[in-house]
Amino acid sequence: MKRIVVALLLLPILCMALSGCDFWMDGQYVSVEPYSEQNFRPEKDMIEVSSSAQLRQAVVDLVESGARSGIISVASFNDATVHFYMEGAIRNVTQNNPIGAYAVDSITYEIGVYSGVDAVALTIHYRYDGDQVMHIKSAQTVGEAEDHVYAALEKFEPSVAVLIQEYQQTDFEYLVQEYAAKNPDIVIETPRVEANLYPEKGQQRVVELVFTYQTSRENLRQMQELVAPVFTSAELYVQPDAQLREKYVQLYNFLMERFDYSLETTITPAYSLLHEGVGDCTAFATVYAAMCRKAGLECHVVSGTREGEPWSWNLIYFMGNYFHVDLLFCSQTGGFAASLGSEMTDYEWDHSAYPSR
């Protein structure tokens, strides 16, 4: 992202006859427009600094508070070093500070006199809006940051930014896909994910995830509301005193008897399957697994091949063993059937990726 550092040294303009301005250069205004307190937030009093380190920190503090402007005393610096230290402070906050690297587009400044003291007046330009700084989430680790990502997915937010204190390399696209697969009732459509890191290196970083959906946010919310009661009904459909295998059968019957399904891939698998009777093997497997988990049953989605073609099915647990269940195969052959791994002769999958006996 291009950063612009601009030092504006305006021509002197006589303004002794004007009022409402106390930022001067050699007794004159440094800006054509009157430079008055009304251009700054009330809390933006002049910041006192006496070293380059304090100057850098003052600029960081302004950015991290979401300020759009600020005035910093530079009385301790001579004219030859003010520009050097200011440009260094701006480079530091826009290139090394996580929040500055993420949020700031450019910083401009003027040098003059404020209330009789040599000072610098900064104007901070943000990528979107200064308020975005206040919306940055905070997490110590990537694991804690995941909760913020999941919350954004559940609300179909267009993006989320998290300041992570101890960042570790993470595949956020896979993280989103995995959460969506386990929660088809919540993540109605799996978005395309763009992950950006600010800065590019360092332990402390802002992670920005941008989500792109094909379906409107309003429609996704409506679909989510329509899907939720179906999952609740499925959970209630399971008899508490039934044997484990029978509970799996009950959920199979609940799902498979809803429609005469049409096999088709959609971008809203849970909604399309449960309200339109349209879905593919992955939609059946993910929805069934989610229903099982809500009912307290262990159930996994297995990705592999069936007769050489990409396929998804389920892995369930009862009677001390893991069994494979292909819902679509069951529907074609007359009912629920659970098979041991050794009996899945037409299927191939990574055995090490899934639990076994």
Listing of model-derived features with the role each one plays in the protein:
Residues 3-24:
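Sec-dependent N-terminal signal peptides of Gram-positive bacterial secreted proteins and lipoproteins
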Residues 18, 271-272, 317, 321:
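Eukaryotic intrinsically disordered, low-complexity regions
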Residues 20-240, 352-357:
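N-terminal accessory/pre-domain segments preceding catalytic cores
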Residues 168-171, 243, 247, 284:
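Short amphipathic alpha-helical segments
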Residues 215-274:
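Secondary-structure boundary elements
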Residues 246, 346-357:
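A short, charged
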Residues 273-282:
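Periplasmic OmpA-like peptidoglycan-binding domain that tethers envelope proteins to the cell wall
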Residues 283-350:
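Hydrophobic/aromatic-rich core segments of domains that either
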